[in-house]
């Protein structure tokens, strides 16, 4: 009887005890799913199962779709290779989509001080 009572009290007083993690993205507004030895960042709004690109069970792109979000993702598909994803004002060394990822890779010809 005593152990059951203690468990009941603990659950009533501390119902949501758990370990804390620091988000890999550093942004407290991002959602992240944590798997053993892997952290997958979810885009804002991905927790909403109505997201058109996201499988609500796995939070991965639906079958036949390439991506959920990102600068090189539109309508659940990767943008074509060579599409400008970050335009620069001064030097003309824009960043371009690769056609195989939703990320916007940095132009390899830019110097360290350029951005």
Curated annotation (Swiss-Prot):
A motif (Cell attachment site) lies at residues 89-91. Residues 26-112 form the Disintegrin domain. Keywords: Cell adhesion impairing toxin, Disulfide bond, Hemostasis impairing toxin, Platelet aggregation inhibiting toxin, Secreted, Signal, Toxin. It holds the Pfam family Disintegrin. SMART domains: DISIN. Coiled coil: none annotated. It is found in: Secreted. Disulfide bonds join 53-76, 67-73, 72-97, 85-104. It comes from the Eukaryota. Residues 21-47 form a propeptide. One of its GO terms (molecular function) is toxin activity. InterPro entries: Disintegrin_CS, Disintegrin_dom, Disintegrin_dom_sf. Its main location: secreted. GO terms for cellular component: extracellular region. SUPFAM superfamilies: Blood coagulation inhibitor (disintegrin). PROSITE patterns: DISINTEGRIN_1 (PS00427), DISINTEGRIN_2 (PS50214). Residues 1-20 form the signal peptide. Expressed by the venom gland. Poor inhibitor of platelet aggregation. The disintegrin inhibits the adhesion of the alpha-4/beta-1 (ITGA4/ITGB1) integrin to VCAM-1. Inhibition on alpha-IIb/beta-3 (ITGA2B/ITGB3) is low. Heterodimer with EO5B; disulfide-linked. Negative results: does not show inhibition of inhibition on alpha-1/beta-1 (ITGA1/ITGB1), alpha-2/beta-1 (ITGA2/ITGB1) and alpha-6/beta-1 (ITGA6/ITGB1). Belongs to the disintegrin family. Dimeric disintegrin subfamily. This is Disintegrin EO5A.
């Amino acid at each position: 009887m005593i152990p059951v009572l203690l468990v009941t009290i603990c659950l009533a007083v501390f119902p949501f005890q758990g370990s804390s993690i620091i988000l890999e993205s550093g942004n407290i507004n991002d959602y992240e799913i944590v798997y053993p030895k892997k952290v997958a960042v979810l885009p804002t709004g991905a927790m909403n199962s109505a997201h058109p690109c996201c499988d609500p069970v796995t939070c991965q792109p639906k079958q036949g779709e390439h991506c959920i979000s990102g600068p090189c993702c539109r309508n659940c598909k990767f943008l074509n290779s060579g599409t400008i994803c970050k335009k620069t004002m001064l030097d003309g060394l824009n960043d371009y989509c690769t056609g195989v990822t939703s990320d916007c890779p940095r132009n390899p010809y830019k110097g360290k001080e350029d951005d």
